[in-house]
A protein has these predicted regions:
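Aromatic-lined carbohydrate-binding surfaces of glycoside hydrolases
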Residues: 37, 70, 149, 156, ...
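The feature captures the catalytic groove of carbohydrate-active enzymes
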Residues: 32, 96-124, 154-209
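Substrate-binding groove/exosite segments of carbohydrate-active enzymes
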Residues: 2-146
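Alpha-helical scaffold segments in carbohydrate-active enzymes
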Residues: 16-20, 65, 148-159, 200-203
Length: 209
């Protein structure tokens, strides 16, 4: 990747970005980190990398791997609230059939829809997928991934906007910080992600019929 600008310092970034990106690619998915936390996480920010650098094949490989990790055969049978009392209600109870661990949830590791994790990594995974559609304009792939998107949107609504006010709670969905509401809150960042996802879904639905 070459960058050509009048600024000699900016021109060095192409190789640096490509090298860093290649370092977090494990052949199947983008990893959480290159050195520390070198492990897969479905919705970590690394998955924006492929499309930004023109590596759309890697991006699609990542998205396919985690689409196969979406729960599809466990309906929600346990109502809100389903928080873990041992952890002072700070996290969802890890039990299949709760709102979090039911259809639509994307599990922690690629091609494995049986492994719970405490994050809502759905949110950024879907945002990255939608950016992939923006970058590539690949309507056939959008059609293929449509069921994944629909299940995700229903899952987010069930879990994080049960009062239907259009404002979504946040649950460990981006950087885990008290300043960003680790759990609950009807906050701006999770609402903004969901607003964009629903708006993009409407556009995609119109295009794919």
């Amino acid at each position: 990747i070459r960058i050509e600008t009048p600024d000699a310092y900016l021109n060095t970034l192409g190789g640096a970005l490509a090298l860093a990106a290649d370092g977090i690619w494990d052949g199947q998915v983008w990893l959480h980190g290159a050195v520390g936390w070198r492990m897969p996480l479905s919705g970590w920010r690394a998955a924006y990398t492929g499309d930004a650098l023109g590596w759309h094949d890697r991006a699609r490989t990542h998205f396919d791997a985690y689409a196969a990790s979406q729960v599809t055969e466990i309906p929600n049978t346990i109502s809100h609230p389903a928080q873990d009392s041992v952890l002072n209600l700070a996290r969802s109870e890890k039990r299949w059939g709760t709102p979090q661990y039911s259809n639509g949830y994307i599990c922690r590791n690629p091609r494995n829809n049986t492994q719970m994790h405490h994050y809502d990594m759905n949110l950024c995974y879907i945002d990255e997928l939608l950016w992939h559609f923006n970058w590539t304009g690949d309507l056939e792939y959008a059609r293929q991934m449509w069921p994944v998107l629909v299940r995700h949107l229903a899952w987010e609504k069930l879990n994080y906007d049960p009062d239907n006010d259009g404002l979504y709670d946040a649950y460990a969905c981006i950087w885990v910080s008290d300043a960003l509401y680790y759990n609950s809150g009807a906050v701006t960042h999770s609402s903004a992600y969901n607003y964009r996802a629903n708006k993009m879904a409407a556009v995609i639905a119109e295009k794919i019929g």
